[in-house]
Structures are given as C-alpha cells and as structure tokens.
Design a protein with these regions (language model features):
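Non-catalytic DNA-recognition/assembly elements of restriction-modification systems
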Residues: 1-31, 36-52, 145-176
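The feature marks the first
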Residues: 8-14, 18-22, 107, 111, ...
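A short beta-turn/loop motif at secondary-structure boundaries
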Residues: 37-38, 63, 129-132
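A short beta-sheet element
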Residues: 56-115
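A short glycine-rich beta-alpha junction/loop motif
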Residues: 90-96, 127-146
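A generic structural motif
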Residues: 102-105, 144-148
Length: 176
C-alpha cells in the first residue's frame, strides 16, 4: 500500500439533514477563573487555544468542573469554533462553551462532530464572537437514517476507517 494513497471514499453529503446544535447538545458557558484564584494541580484547564486539546494549564480548583465525554468549543478570539473532545473532568474558561451530548457519545462520534462544529464556528467573525444563543441555534448537517434521525453508526464507522488508515500509514512509515 502506498503511504500517499487514500482508502477513504469521498462522502456524499447531498442527503445529509440539518440539526440545530441545541437539538443534539446542551450548550453551557464556561466559567471565569482569575489567575489569583487559580491553584496549581492536575485538572485540565481548557481555554481559547488551538493546541494541546485546548489545555492551557492544570489546576486543582474543583468548583466548576465539567465531566469527561463532552466537547469544548472556543467561541472567542482567533480560534473561534475550535472544538475538542475532553476525556477527563476539566474546568472550561469563560472563552469556551461546553457541549453536553443528548445522545450516547463516544470518542469516535466526538471526532466526527468536532470538525463539523468547527466549520460552522469558522463562519463567525473574530470581533463578533460565537455567542451562546447563536451557537445553540446554528445548524450542522449530518448523515441520517431513513427515519430522519442522525446516523451515528455511519459516523462511528467513518471515523474508525480514518483511524485504521492512519494506523496503516504510520506502520508503513515506520518500515521505510
């Protein structure tokens, strides 16, 4: 197999249907924590960053933690729309909105949703911000089953194909 070839088919999105973000997620604003109140620790502190899964430091403050298996979305600054899947409890700054899934989410589904949400967020201007109410109303298009509900199985299998292809490419590169 050639390291540059792609085993992934182009997705036909013509039959995808629109869903308001708030139909799929409860959207909650993060909380301000001043440097003076910040205590060093091991809890991820998620901010307006496009690096390191949004983690800007680690703290021990526990008053405003969000659970694992949620998404964080930067709504402010140059990284508007940047979306990350959080795998452990964390504190989200007030530059970040937290998306609590209204469905059974796993890492593969989160990896599907993150770039879809980022694309919508990228439509907002830097000075405008992606306000909480706008984020709730904004629409993402998703693959659907015959009954019109999101096709989560398709989303999971697509991400699994991407992971498999990436693993195979890494294996090829290791053997060069």
């Amino acid at each position: 197999s050639d390291v540059c070839s792609s085993d992934l088919e182009v997705i036909d999105t013509s039959n995808w249907k629109p869903f308001a973000i708030s139909d799929l997620f409860d959207v909650v604003k993060g909380s301000r924590l001043t440097k003076a109140d910040m205590r060093e620790g091991t809890i991820p502190y998620i901010g307006a960053s496009s690096f390191n899964n949004g983690i800007t430091t680690y703290i021990s403050n526990t008053e405003q933690l969000h659970p694992a298996n949620t998404l964080t979305v930067c709504y402010n600054g140059s990284d508007i729309g940047r979306t990350f899947y959080q795998t452990e409890p964390y504190w989200a700054t007030d530059d970040v909105n937290v998306l609590y899934p209204k469905f059974e989410m796993n890492e593969d589904l989160a990896m599907f949703f993150a770039p879809v949400i980022k694309c919508v967020g990228g439509l907002h201007e830097y000075g405008d911000k992606w306000k909480l109410e706008d984020m709730k109303k904004d629409v993402i298009k998703l693959p659907v089953k015959d009954d019109g509900t999101p096709d989560f199985m398709f989303m999971e299998s697509y991400i699994q194909k991407i992971k498999k292809a990436a693993t195979e490419r890494i294996s090829i590169l290791r053997n060069i």
